[in-house]
């Protein structure tokens, strides 16, 4: 699956939000290069909507075609389209691995999933965009537990809060999905209604 692989800090500075999580370079200088930082640009309604879409896309590592597909799926579901969109993004397997604390970044989580380190309900899944469901059980493969990323994960588990809709068993890094997340449980700094307005035009 295609994805953005360019400099994440540059994107964070352009959109004025840490898209990686714990990006020290962004924290030191949260504005684009240049003596005076980014030139002042009139923020039209369209620009604000576009920025929110870009934030969501780069936060979750999704390109336009797949993002639009997620929006269309969210729009078909009952309830608020914006809430549904964030729920679909949060339920990606790579995001769940990241949220559970088994990877430092979503990029790293995507790589771990792609390399086949996980099973879902006992079956190998190596598709980062795989949608987890309520009651799913995600395990690290036994032979993978002894590799460096998961040794580090065991040592650092709990350093980052795990959302209430997930549970992690520290002894074997098992992830239990108790429910699909509600909007209040998603801390992604995105105003999803602006994305809905953009696609509704």
From Swiss-Prot:
Residues 91-157 form the S4 RNA-binding domain. Keywords: Ribonucleoprotein, Ribosomal protein, RNA-binding, rRNA-binding. One of the primary rRNA binding proteins, it binds directly to 16S rRNA where it nucleates assembly of the body of the 30S subunit. With S5 and S12 plays an important role in translational accuracy. The lineage of its organism: Bacteria, Bacillati, Actinomycetota, Actinomycetes, Pseudonocardiales. The keyword Ion transport does not apply. The keyword Membrane does not apply. Pfam families: Ribosomal_S4 (PF00163), S4 (PF01479). SMART domains: Ribosomal_S4, S4. This is Small ribosomal subunit protein uS4. It comes from the Bacteria. InterPro entries: Ribosomal_uS4 (IPR022801), Ribosomal_uS4_bac-type (IPR005709), Ribosomal_uS4_CS (IPR018079), Ribosomal_uS4_N (IPR001912), S4_RNA-bd (IPR002942), S4_RNA-bd_sf (IPR036986). One of its GO terms (molecular function) is rRNA binding. Belongs to the universal ribosomal protein uS4 family. Part of the 30S ribosomal subunit. Contacts protein S5. The interaction surface between S4 and S5 is involved in control of translational fidelity. NCBIfam families: PRK05327.1, rpsD_bact. GO terms for biological process: ribosomal small subunit biogenesis; translation. One of its GO terms (cellular component) is small ribosomal subunit.
């Amino acid at each position: 699956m295609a994805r953005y692989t360019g400099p994440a800090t540059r994107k964070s500075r352009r959109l004025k939000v840490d898209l990686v999580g714990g990006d020290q370079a962004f924290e030191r200088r949260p504005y684009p290069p240049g003596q005076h930082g980014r030139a002042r640009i009139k923020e039209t309604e369209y620009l604000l909507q576009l920025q929110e879409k870009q934030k969501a896309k780069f936060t979750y590592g999704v390109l336009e075609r797949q993002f639009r597909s997620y929006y269309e799926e969210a729009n078909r579901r009952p309830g608020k389209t914006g809430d549904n969109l964030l729920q679909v993004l949060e339920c990606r397997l790579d995001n769940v691995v990241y949220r559970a604390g088994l990877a430092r970044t979503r990029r790293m989580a995507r790589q771990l999933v792609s390399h086949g380190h996980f099973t879902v309900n006992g079956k190998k899944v190596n598709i980062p965009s795989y949608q987890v469901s309520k009651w799913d059980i995600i395990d690290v493969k036994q032979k993978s537990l002894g590799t460096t990323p998961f040794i580090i994960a065991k040592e650092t588990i709990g350093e980052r809060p795990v959302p209430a809709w997930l549970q992690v068993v520290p002894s074997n890094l098992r992830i239990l999905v108790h429910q699909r997340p509600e909007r209040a449980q998603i801390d992604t700094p995105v105003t999803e209604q602006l994305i809905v307005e953009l696609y509704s035009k």
